């Protein structure tokens, strides 16, 4: 069983998957959002392909730790995923993951155009890896 990581944006969803042992996260793709039903169908494909029973969703929090409108949207979407796909949804504080993703891509000397295309996939990898690191310490 693997674990999926999602970075939910208003236009795209970054998708990452754990290795079979749950130690490392690898970025899979970025899905262009269309509507809720199609977004859920895309996520279901990944759940089926990787036999994922747990999905970690990045939870946007304000810098003071409170949950704002984006966080509420992520939590509502997570609830829909949980109900429709019969998977366990976990939330992971995603503060600064996109910043870290941009920094890593700049250090890798990726062009602005390339960074724009993969930033959500890279951010989903950071989200999932943070969660995997936390559960491995338990």
UniProtKB/Swiss-Prot annotation:
Pfam families: RuvX
Subcellular location: Cytoplasm
Domain of life: Bacteria
Cellular component GO terms, alphabetical: cytosol
Keyword tags: Cytoplasm, Hydrolase, Nuclease, Ribosome biogenesis
GO molecular function: nuclease activity
Keyword Cytoplasm recorded: yes
GO aspect biological process, one term: rRNA 5'-end processing
NCBIfam families reported in the protein's UniProt record: RNAse_H_YqgF
Function, as annotated: Could be a nuclease involved in processing of the 5'-end of pre-16S rRNA.
Protein name: Putative pre-16S rRNA nuclease
Organism this protein belongs to: Clostridium beijerinckii (strain ATCC 51743 / NCIMB 8052) (Clostridium acetobutylicum)
């Amino acid at each position: 069983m693997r674990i999926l990581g999602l970075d939910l944006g208003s236009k795209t969803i970054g998708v990452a998957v754990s290795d079979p042992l749950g130690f490392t996260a690898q970025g899979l793709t970025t899905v262009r959002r269309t509507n809720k039903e199609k977004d859920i169908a895309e996520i279901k494909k990944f759940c089926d392909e990787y036999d994922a029973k747990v999905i970690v969703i990045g939870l946007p929090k304000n810098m003071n730790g409170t949950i704002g409108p984006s966080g509420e949207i992520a939590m509502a979407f997570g609830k829909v995923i949980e109900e429709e796909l019969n998977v366990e949804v976990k939330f992971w504080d995603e503060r600064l993951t996109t910043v870290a993703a941009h920094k890593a891509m700049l250090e890798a000397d990726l062009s602005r155009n390339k960074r724009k295309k993969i930033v959500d996939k890279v951010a989903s990898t950071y989200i999932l890896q943070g969660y995997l690191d936390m559960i491995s310490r338990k």
